[in-house]
């Protein structure tokens, strides 16, 4: 008998339909065709044991499984459940009437219990698009998939429950989540607050500008000056995720298997901080089993690279394209896929190997060659893509011992949200553009042209600091953001001056001006 079950395969962060056809006929053997990987081929023994442990006889005949479309590679053990159900239906142990109305995905253990899978959210979205009656999956993935409205999410604990449900002798209780209530519940809950930061008002201002416009920022300062501490508080002043951004962010983490158990929807912007020993593949994604990398896991959030020069140069250089395009395209011999990568890059570094160049009290022990070599680990093209380059000075004793709290994150966040609202209105007819950092050259000409005095100051700075055309664009974008924070329709000369002041590493007097 021929039986069909419906499953899904993840490509990028979306799912595509996979139809599993099973025939049980005279003969012997178990064969899976349709471009399965090793894990799918190995499922034969897992499925056999799980079926027997569930109390059913595995057919003593020839089992032929075809997974279509045949040109899409089927990876992982999540196909165990649809394979097992298809085999039992082909052996006439399951009523086939309901089988084509539900998507089934889940890994089987040898005792027949269901284990969690990756990518449940995009699969649930696909099931809704296919107008199926529901999605049967492991219980650990139920809350994640239940974010999708207008689809019945049916969690199961083991194979027996699924078989009995399809035969009409057992009811699977649907999992229901109020997506909007879950989304609103956790808004504004952050573990860190800028009120804890003493002093550093210029750095806080730079962070405010960066968040208001979605700009990349680099902090350069001695050890203990508070670079990492302030960077960790950045999500607390970023604008809240929209519902569509939250869904997209959750999809990426679902595909990567990074969602904590029981999570429904990611309601705060991600903050990713990889170690400097990370490989290029781990950063941008890919591998033999394509997975999102750190830059995609930071999508709609922050990618924090602490001690930037300690990262391998090849790792840093692969970020150049996604920093511009906000998407990462991965092409290999056997596949090609894309992952979103619209993140805010926040990096920190010491000014020299010993860390104390420019320190007001401690003496630097590095020579000029060591300092220049240290800075040269960051290429000019990468540095050009960082809009704000800020020197962080150590906090003096009076500020450190002050009992007065700093400005709370909530107050800064309100100004950031107001500036973002101006940008949303400005770019409402520009597809894919949501903030000033994403402006194209034509939009810069339209919205960020400075007044005559500002243009003259920009010309003088460009000539003195020998800045590139990309740096010119970045200054205009930052100046536009500063104007938005003041609710000013025009970009004025003092906006340009403040934006230029954030290009610290471009100064001729800075020892890092030889970065290449």
Where are these regions (language model features)?
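Peripheral, non-AAA+ core regions of ATP-driven protein-machinery
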Residues: 1-218, 222-225, 331, 471-472, ...
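Short beta-strand elements
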Residues: 18-24, 283, 387-390
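Basic, amphipathic alpha-helical bundle interface domains used for macromolecular binding and assembly
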Residues: 33, 39-44, 59, 66-76, ...
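Residues immediately C-terminal
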Residues: 110, 303-304, 310-311, 397
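P-loop NTPase nucleotide-binding/switch module
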Residues: 170-209, 213, 240-295
């Amino acid at each position: 008998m021929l039986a069909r079950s419906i499953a899904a395969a993840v490509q990028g962060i979306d799912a595509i339909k996979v139809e599993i056809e099973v025939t049980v006929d005279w003969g012997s053997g178990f064969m899976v065709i349709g471009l399965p990987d090793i894990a799918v081929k190995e499922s034969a023994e897992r499925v056999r044991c799980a079926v027997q442990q569930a109390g059913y006889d595995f057919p003593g005949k020839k089992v032929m499984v075809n997974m279509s479309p045949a040109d899409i590679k089927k990876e992982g053990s999540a196909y165990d459940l649809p394979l097992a159900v298809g085999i039992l239906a082909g052996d006439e142990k399951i009523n086939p009437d309901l089988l084509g109305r539900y998507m089934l995905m889940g890994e089987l253990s040898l005792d027949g219990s269901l284990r969690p899978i990756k990518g449940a959210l995009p699969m649930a979205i696909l099931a809704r698009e296919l107008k199926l009656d529901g999605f049967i999956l492991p219980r650990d993935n139920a809350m994640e998939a239940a974010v999708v409205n207008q689809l019945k999410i049916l969690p199961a604990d083991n194979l027996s429950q699924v078989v009995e449900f399809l035969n009409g002798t057992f009811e699977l209780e649907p999992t229901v989540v109020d997506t909007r209530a879950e989304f609103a519940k956790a808004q504004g809950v952050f573990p860190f607050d800028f009120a804890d930061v003493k002093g550093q008002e210029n750095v806080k201002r730079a962070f405010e500008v960066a968040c208001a416009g979605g700009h990349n920022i680099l902090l350069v300062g001695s050890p203990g000056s508070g670079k990492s501490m302030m960077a960790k508080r950045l999500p607390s002043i970023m604008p809240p995720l929209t519902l569509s951004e939250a869904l997209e962010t959750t999809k990426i983490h679902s595909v990567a298997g990074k969602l904590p158990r029981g999570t429904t929807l990611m309601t705060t912007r991600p903050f990713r901080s990889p170690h400097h020993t990370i490989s290029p593949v781990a950063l941008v994604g890919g591998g033999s089993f394509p997975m999102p990398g750190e830059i995609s896991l930071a999508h709609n959030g922050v990618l924090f690279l602490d001690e930037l020069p300690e990262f391998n140069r090849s790792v840093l250089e692969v970020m150049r394209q996604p920093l511009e395009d906000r998407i990462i395209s991965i092409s290999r011999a056997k596949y090609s896929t894309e992952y979103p990568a619209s993140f805010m890059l926040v990096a920190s570094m010491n000014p020299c190997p010993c860390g104390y160049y420019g320190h007001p009290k401690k003496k630097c022990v590095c020579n000029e060659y060591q300092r220049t070599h240290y800075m040269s680990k960051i290429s000019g093209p990468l540095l050009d893509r960082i809009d704000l380059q800020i020197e962080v000075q150590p906090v003096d004793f009076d500020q450190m011992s002050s009992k007065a709290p700093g400005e709370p994150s909530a107050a800064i966040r309100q100004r950031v949200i107001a500036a973002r609202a101006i940008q949303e209105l400005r770019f409402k007819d520009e597809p894919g553009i949501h903030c000033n950092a994403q402006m194209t050259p034509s939009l810069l000409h339209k919205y960020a042209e400075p007044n005559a005095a500002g243009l003259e100051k920009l010309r003088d700075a460009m000539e003195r600091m020998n800045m590139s055309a990309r740096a010119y664009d970045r200054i205009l974008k930052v100046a536009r953001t500063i104007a938005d924070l003041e609710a000013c329709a025009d970009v004025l000369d003092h906006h340009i001056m403040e934006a230029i002041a954030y290009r610290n590493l471009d100064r001729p007097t800075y020892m890092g001006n030889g970065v290449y």
